Amino acid sequence: MHCVVIGGGLSGLASALWLSEAGHRVTLLERRGSLGGRTTAIPLDIVDDVPDNGQHVFASGYVHLMRYLDSVGTRESVCFPGHMTVRMPGGGTRRSAFGRVAGLRADKPDISSAKVPADLLVTGIREARRTKTPISIGYPTVDLDTLFIDGAKKAFANNGVEVRHRAVVAGVEVVDGTVAGVILNDGERIPAGAVICAVPVWNVKGLLDQVPGHERIYEAIEHLTPVPIVSVNLYLDRSIGMTDWGEILYGGEGVLEQVWDRQQMHSRNASRNHFYSTTVSAAYELTQKSNAEITETQMDMLRRYYPDAAGAEVIHSHVVRMPKSTFAQRPGSSGIRPDQRTAVAGLALAGDWTRTDWTTTMEGACQSAARAVDVILDYANQPR
Ligand SMILES: Cc1cc2nc3c(=O)[nH]c(=O)nc-3n(C[C@H](O)[C@H](O)[C@H](O)COP(=O)(O)OP(=O)(O)OC[C@H]3O[C@@H](n4cnc5c(N)ncnc54)[C@H](O)[C@@H]3O)c2cc1C
C-alpha cells in the first residue's frame, strides 16, 4: 500500500519508518528544508560546534522513543546517570528525587491544568513499577541530528522511503469515507492508500476539512496553546564549576531554569571554550527581549548560582527562541486530545498533541506514531 506521512518531526519520522518496516511504500512530506521538526541540531561554524535548538531530556519510561532509536541505531547514545542536581543561589547543591522528575518541561501553574503533571506522575510511576527501575532522567550524548535524523535517512534509503522537502500539505482528500490522498499547497495531488497526518496542533487547521467530525479535532487548537522555550548556547572562556551534567536552579525567576554542561554530557573537549546551555521554560516575557538582553539575563543568572562564573567572558552566545515548543493544556480541557483513529478509513493522526499516556514530549510523539501505524496496519489487513 502507498502510505503518505505528513510532517517530518519525530512522530512523522517514526510513522514513516515503522510503516516501511512493515513492508509498505512510504512518501514522507515535510514543509521545511530539513527533517526533525522541534528536535534539531543547529551547526554553528563560528565556534565549529553543533548545538541543539534546545536541550532535550529523556525519562526512563520513554519506551516508544527507545524503539525509534533502535530502528535508527542510536540507542547507545542516550545515557541515564540516575541523578540531577538542584543548585541554590550562591552555589550550594542538593541531589534530590525532585531533580529526577523536574527535568521535564513546565508551564506557568496559574494557567495550565494540574491534571497534566498529575497524569505524568502516574505514567512515570506505572512505568517504574512495570520496569522495576526508579524514574530517572537521561540525556543524549550526541547532537539531535546525529541522534534522530542521520540513522533515519539511512533506514529510509534502505526501505525505499521517499522524502520530499518543502512539500506543504494543504489538505487530506477523502472519497466516500475513505482516504484518497493529499493535496499540496501548489495544487499537486498525491494519491495514497493510507495517510498519517503528523503535524503539530497549531498547523492542523484546514488539513482535515473533508474529515467528518473535524470540528471536534480542531477544538484542540483552542485548548492546547503554545508554550515558548528560550535556550541560550553559551560558549565561555572558562568552566563555571558545574558538579552535575544538568542542574535545576532553585528559586529562579521563571517557572523552571536549567543549565546543561556539554563537556560532561558529550565528553566535549574544552580546550577552545566551555559550552553551557541554559533553558528557560514558559519564557513568555524573555522571548520578547533582544538577544543581547537575553544573554545578559542568563549570564547574570549563572553568576548568581556559580561563583566560578563571576569573571567569565562570553566568547559566543547563540539564542534560540522557540515560541511554539510545547503546548499547555488549559484547565477543563481533559479529553480534548483526539484519538489517532479518525472517522475516515485509512487516515490516522499522530503528533505529541494527540491522545497518549504522556504530555507534550518526544515519547508522546513516538507513542502516537506507534498507535497511528497500528491503525493503518489494521486497515491494510482488512479485506476489501
Ligand atoms: C526547546 C524544546 C525543548 C524540549 N524539551 C523536551 C524534553 O526535554 N523532553 C521531551 O520529551 N520533549 C521535549 N520537547 C518537546 C518535543 O520536542 C516535542 O514534543 C516533539 O518533538 C514533537 O514531535 P512531533 O512530531 O509531534 O511534532 P514536530 O516536531 O513539530 O513535527 C511536525 C512536523 O510537521 C511539519 N509540518 C507542519 N505542517 C505541515 C504541512 N502542512 N505539510 C507538511 N509538513 C508540515 C513541521 O514542519 C514539522 O517538521 C521540547 C521541545 C522544544 C522545542
Q: Predicted segment positions?
A:
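Conserved FAD-binding subdomain of flavin-dependent enzymes
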Residues: R38-A41, I46-F80
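Mid-domain catalytic core of redox enzymes
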Residues: V168-Q288, D300, R304-Y305
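N-terminal Rossmann-like FAD-binding beta1-loop-alpha1 element of flavoenzymes
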Residues: M1-L28
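Conserved flavin/dinucleotide-binding core of flavoenzymes
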Residues: G241-I248, G252-R384
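Mobile amphipathic helical/loop "lid" adjacent to a hydrophobic cofactor/ligand pocket
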Residues: L65-P134
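Active-site/ligand-binding neighborhood in enzyme catalytic cores
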Residues: A106-V175, A180
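Glycine-rich FAD pyrophosphate-binding loop
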Residues: S20-D45
